[in-house]
Structures are given as structure tokens and as C-alpha cells.
Regions:
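A conserved amphipathic terminal alpha-helix motif
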Residues: 129-168
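Beta-strand/loop substructures that line and gate deep hydrophobic ligand-binding cavities in soluble
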Residues: 92, 96-145
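Hydrophobic/aromatic beta-strand elements that line small-molecule binding cavities or substrate pockets
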Residues: 19, 51-54, 76-82, 107-115
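Hydrophobic ligand-binding cavity/cleft-lining segments
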Residues: 1-48
């Protein structure tokens, strides 16, 4: 089970959660940066991610589709702003590939990975919002519970990479 850790927002209008993931940082990184792995965990069940298109470099695509149990479909288009291998990712939906602005955007997200003191990976996920209303909307959508569930799924996906047959 992904163990909750206490983390505090580092900027105004930010929501953040932290977990210790019982898997090596490299495996957690792969789950964030490889489309087929991201699809396994990125949305809390019973929702799923049937499509993911990732070009993990500044300005590259971060496009996903979320599918709900009743046929709902949410397309999410964004870009990566920063990619520091096995350490940090920053992405936003304020732009699409090539830094083309799109609408008002919802958030800029970041992921920080580091080695946990007693093994595993320290995982921090933050979402920074343009407005107080946007942040409150994200809270009401279930930010903490949803990302807590996704962190459990992330841990499961990362652990699946530990099988010698699946390592590259």
C-alpha cells in the first residue's frame, strides 16, 4: 500500500499529496513516462485511460483520454514543461504541443520523485491553479481521494515492472 506522507503546498493555489511508493524510482518514472504504463493507473477506477500519447520533453505532448463507467469521455491535452529523468516532471493544460495556447487551462501539475529513506520512492504530486475557484473545483472533484487511489494504482503498476521478465 502506498503510504501517505505529510507534504505542504509550496505555492499559493496549490493542492498536493505525498506517498511512499513501494517500488524503485526508475519503475515509478517509467509508469509516468511510458504511455502503455500510464494507461494502467493514471485515473482512479472505475474510470480508465484508454488513450495516452506522450512525448516527454519540454513542449512535447501529454495527451490522455479518460473514460467513465457510464460512457463518459474526457479528452485532456497538454504539454510537458520540464522533464528531469527519474526526478521531476512538470506539465500543463494551458498549452498544447508546440506551446500553442488553449482556452483558459485548468492547472499546472508537477511530480517529484526521490529515494525514500527506508526504500521505495518518495512521490509528491502537486497541482497549481490559476484561480481560487479552479483550485476549489479540483478539491471538490476529489483531488485528494482520487490521487490517493491513483497512487495505489501507480504502486501496483510500478511493482509489476519488478518481474525479471518485464524489466528491460
Amino acid at each position: 500500500m502506498a503510504t501517505p506522507i505529510d507534504v505542504k503546498p509550496s505555492a499559493p493555489l496549490e493542492l498536493v499529496i505525498g506517498r511512499i511508493i513501494d517500488a524503485p524510482r526508475r519503475a515509478v518514472w517509467r509508469c509516468w513516462t511510458e504511455a502503455e504504463l500510464l494507461k494502467q493507473w493514471y485515473c482512479p477506477k472505475p474510470w480508465s485511460v484508454p488513450e495516452a500519447d506522450l512525448d516527454v520533453r519540454p513542449g512535447g505532448r501529454f495527451n490522455t483520454v479518460f473514460a467513465g463507467p457510464d460512457g463518459e469521455r474526457m479528452e485532456n491535452k497538454g504539454i510537458w514543461l520540464e522533464s528531469v529523468p527519474e526526478t521531476r516532471l512538470v506539465f500543463t493544460d494551458f498549452f498544447t504541443e508546440g506551446f500553442v495556447p488553449q482556452g483558459e487551462g485548468f492547472m499546472t501539475g508537477y511530480v517529484e520523485l526521490s529515494d525514500a529513506t527506508r526504500g521505495g520512492t518518495r512521490f509528491v504530486w502537486g497541482a497549481r491553479h490559476r484561480t481560487e475557484a479552479g483550485m476549489r473545483q479540483h478539491e471538490e472533484m476529489g483531488f485528494e481521494a482520487g490521487w490517493g487511489a491513483a497512487a495505489e494504482q501507480l504502486e501496483e503498476a510500478a511493482k509489476s515492472l519488478l518481474s525479471p521478465a518485464l524489466q528491460d
